[in-house]
């Protein structure tokens, strides 16, 4: 397919292209790569996450510590699925190896299967693209990267009509893109770890346009503000109805360091970028 009469239509190779990117030069004419720079700075562990999640805990010490304690070379955070039919891949063991099984690959019967001991879903570990790696493992990816399979994504691809030369913006999928996924490396790990976290504290994806009703800018904003309200209330404060307070992670990363709010009642909305600014919202 042609993007213009003189240009072939191309597309990114998916978030699985991350691994090859770590071996690419940091800038034109330079030999340094992400991996060589990490080695130069003696970095042993890396946290990677999907950028569309406003509740992500960057370099979460709990996740990093858990993964290191487990001596994992790769690890993933997961959240419990909300329902059997939720459109999310699950971390599972397939062929004696850890992998992410896409929701489209699971039958209705498998999706609804219950754990005989807990009564919960058997396949409940929803993948949220939140991963831990050792730099040793990242360096090893190149040795098996050619074995990773491409995934087919059917997309609406703008193109040029070869007969008229006019640009066409299709209303339905008209082509296939070949993509790699960041979790495709899971089956190649020697020690894999999984940490289940609370969805309302660590996962609010932004995937849809404004006004969609779920996983959109409004739901991301709602979930972030609700979390920060919980931070204040757990610390002993009261927050009046309809008051919206956003707390910079420079003030509190996960609700810690807010002892000064105990007993206070917040009546004004605002963005808090320094602890002393909280007093102005009482």
Question: What name fits each language-model region?
Answer:
Residues 110-121, 125-282:
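Terminal amphipathic alpha-helical/low-complexity segments used for targeting or macromolecular assembly
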